[in-house]
Amino acid sequence: MIDKDKIREGMKLILEAIGEDANREGLIETPDRIARMYEEIFSGIGMNAKEHLSKTFEVHSNDLVLEKDITFYSMCEHHLVPFYGKVHIAYIPNGRVVGLSKLARCVEVYSKKPQLQERLTTEIADSIMEYLDAQGVMVVVEGEHMCMTMRGVRKPGAKTVTTTYRGKFLEDESLKNDVFRMISM
């Protein structure tokens, strides 16, 4: 899906456009390195989390499941610079759960493409609701955006927090508060 030849050509043009010699020793292989890196960091393009969330296990409990501090890296679609941080996923099963590593895979699918943090948050929640048939989902994403750190307002350490709620989390404020308390532990 990734056209590495076009990326190489484009990267060489960018280097030349900023006044660099694209053929000098330190840069001559940069277009190829960027093409390989883009293949990896944009591997979520065209994917959805169904393959990771389709194998479930029966449980006889509908108690809350929280997977917190899932690290992620993504690329801001506005500036194509990284944003990164942590995702916290809480869900209430409907008689079935998924292996915990699959929640991290779900995060990877949606973070490995040009992305907005707000959309990342909702895509994760919507996929868990749909593929796990959960009674409720809450997703909290904490991200630091390099577009705010290294350019523009230049505010290193500023974090953006996005949340979304589905199902029972929309109805029960104490449930949300429980998750926020557990995240801060």
Swiss-Prot record:
Keyword Metal-binding: yes
Encoding gene, per UniProt annotation: folE
GO molecular function, one term: GTP cyclohydrolase I activity
UniProt protein name: GTP cyclohydrolase 1
Pathway(s): Cofactor biosynthesis; 7,8-dihydroneopterin triphosphate biosynthesis; 7,8-dihydroneopterin triphosphate from GTP: step 1/1
Keywords: GTP-binding, Hydrolase, Metal-binding, Nucleotide-binding, One-carbon metabolism, Zinc
Enzyme class at the top of the EC tree: hydrolase
Residues that hold Zn(2+) according to the record: C76, H79, C147
Coiled coil: none
InterPro entries according to UniProt: GTP-CH-I_C/QueF, GTP-CH-I_N, GTP_CycHdrlase_I, GTP_CycHdrlase_I_CS, GTP_CycHdrlase_I_dom
Assembly behavior: Toroid-shaped homodecamer, composed of two pentamers of five dimers.
GO cellular component: cytoplasm
PANTHER family noted in UniProt: GTP CYCLOHYDROLASE 1, GTP CYCLOHYDROLASE I
Superkingdom of this protein's organism: Bacteria
Catalysed reactions, as listed in the record: GTP + H2O = 7,8-dihydroneopterin 3'-triphosphate + formate + H(+)
Pfam families: GTP_cyclohydroI
Family the UniProt entry places it in: Belongs to the GTP cyclohydrolase I family.
One GO BP annotation of this record: one-carbon metabolic process
NCBIfam families to which the protein is assigned, alphabetical: folE, PRK09347.1-2, PRK09347.1-3
